[in-house]
Amino acid sequence: MKNLVKVERARLDLTQAELANKLSVSRQTIHAIEKNKFNPSVVLAIKMAKLFKLSVEELFKIDED
């Protein structure tokens, strides 16, 4: 799964720690999501999409392999 979390975080001029704080998760969680090493829960994905004013589908794209 690919995502635009890093791009959208930069657009809002947020650090990983600031984004993590807004979402009540650790900075390491944000780092892992950005590096595609961790897929967020549905609840976290929805929170992120709302924060970035995107749909979940726009923020997270499933590889069609």
Regions found by a protein language model. Give the residues of each.
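Short, Lys/Arg-enriched C-terminal cap helix and immediately downstream tail that follows
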Residues: E8, V42-V43
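DNA major-groove recognition helix of helix-turn-helix/homeodomain DNA-binding modules
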Residues: L44-E58
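Phosphate-coordinating loops and pocket residues in cytosolic domains that bind phosphorylated ligands
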Residues: K61
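Recognition helix of helix-turn-helix/homeodomain-like DNA-binding domains
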Residues: V25-F38
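Residues in the helix-turn-helix
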Residues: E18, T29, E58
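Short amphipathic helical patch at the helix-1/turn junction of helix-turn-helix
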Residues: A10, F38-N39
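Short basic helix-loop element that most often maps to the first helix and adjoining turn
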Residues: N3-K22
